Amino acid sequence: MEVISTNTNGSTIFKNGAIPMNGHQSGTSKHLNGYQNGTSKHQNGHHNGTSEHRNGHQNGISEHQNGHQNGTSEQQNGTISHDNGNELLGNSNSIKLGWFSEFSALWPGEAFSLKVEKLLFQGKSDYQDVMLFESATYGKVLTLDGAIQHTENGGFPYTEMIVHLPLGSIPNPKKVLIIGGGIGFTLFEMLRYPTIEKIDIVEIDDVVVDVSRKSFPYLAANFNDPRVTLVLGDGAAFVKAAQAGYYDAIIVDSSDPIGPAKDLFERPFFEAVAKALRPGGVVCTQAESIWLHMHIIKQIIANCRQVFKGSVNYAWTTVPTYPTGVIGYMLCSTEGPEVDFKNPINPIDKETTQVKSKLAPLKFYNSDIHKAAFILPSFARSMIES
């Protein structure tokens, strides 16, 4: 493994010596708080983040839910804008009476709670509050700024689908970029593919990586794979600085497209992603819940259709610890060899194919679920196709 971090002025130094633009800290995860691009899903003002999964806008563990507003979104020149309705409903990163609860203006009128068996870690990085606890039902739970990023025994549907939907749709993936993924679940799934030669992981928050090394050693061990380069820095800037046509696939395990995180879902970022992909290359990014955010999903699709000249598709799956129990994905390809996302050509679940692994069996993904992920409820289909 090669680890690349940032220099004294805060900019990231890559292997080729390029120093990316300051400001948008892109990151690494799908959920975290506010780091615009990948690693956090909440609103700290750092573009991207570090966590591996999910939604969450700042929310907290507060017991009160006063006066939250649900902002509407508009699209202007490819941007996703909201009013000030995404404020946190409580910013207390603590456990109340043995329960962790997550409130957010992103899902007003509802909350999600888990019984806490043991607090394993609580601290503050340069970017966010980080907490890890043992839950009664889902094993270890990682939260960032009060938002659940991943659960050990409930997050595997998200991870398996964000990796195998795109990589199962192209032959012989070799070079892959992960924006986010500092815990290591996404990397774990990616290493099932023996054809892969190079994996770059961009994580903004070194504390998240440290938590992985201490609490998920079986995941952190994969950072030592000689094919892996771990970059502690800005994911959006990394993509902009990437060599044109270099990657076969890019996985964007990003934060929500609201507040500072919205840059990861707008045209300039998608244009940088498309440039970094080879002809017929693929990208998969998280794309919210059809039960809460259809207006956001429509804007993301509109942006992607303007940039990606291959195919643009929306898929979804179930994740028990995410709001409404579901999460969506955008899957797009660049112009070149045709990519049919709905019919996997490289199905990792088939022992008879070239894709074999010594890892534990898949818990969620299979070829049938791959195909079914693109079948949408009538209300969602009509809105997306309109």
From Swiss-Prot:
Record-level Gene Ontology MF annotations: putrescine N-methyltransferase activity; spermidine synthase activity
Bias type Polar residues, positions: 1-14, 23-48, 57-87
GO CC terms of this entry: cytosol
Region (Disordered): 1-87
Family: Belongs to the class I-like SAM-binding methyltransferase superfamily. Putrescine methyltransferase family.
Function: Involved in the biosynthesis of pyridine alkaloid natural products, leading mainly to the production of anabasine, anatabine, nicotine and nornicotine, effective deterrents against herbivores with antiparasitic and pesticide properties (neurotoxins); nornicotine serves as the precursor in the synthesis of the carcinogen compound N'-nitrosonornicotine (NNN). Methyltransferase that mediates the conversion of putrescine to N-methylputrescine. Promotes leaves ripening.
Annotated protein name in UniProt: Putrescine N-methyltransferase 4
Protein source organism: Nicotiana tabacum (Common tobacco)
Organism lineage: Eukaryota, Viridiplantae, Streptophyta, Embryophyta, Tracheophyta
Gene: PMT4
